[in-house]
């Protein structure tokens, strides 16, 4: 209850860099909307970030790797 969250969207490397940045933002917005629907207070969401394909956690050379790169991350910051 004492945390703020920034929602960070990521993609794999398929598609152009511009497309992937927009896709990662849409992904973050979609998760934000779902969290609000589930009752998270809007003031808890302090930001949305679109990282596109820039920060892969796995290789984009395999389907499994691409699947891992299509993700959302939550950055939590404790409220004072």
Residue ranges and their predicted role:
Residues 2-4:
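A general structural motif
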Residues 10-80:
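Periplasmic OmpA-like peptidoglycan-binding domain that tethers envelope proteins to the cell wall
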């Amino acid at each position: 209850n004492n945390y703020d969250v920034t929602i960070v969207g990521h993609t794999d490397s398929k598609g152009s860099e511009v497309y992937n940045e927009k896709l990662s933002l849409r992904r973050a917005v979609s998760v934000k909307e779902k969290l609000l629907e589930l009752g998270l207070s809007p003031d808890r969401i302090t930001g949305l970030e679109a990282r596109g394909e820039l920060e892969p956690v796995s290789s984009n050379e395999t389907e499994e790797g691409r699947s891992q790169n299509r993700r959302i991350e939550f950055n939590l910051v404790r409220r004072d």
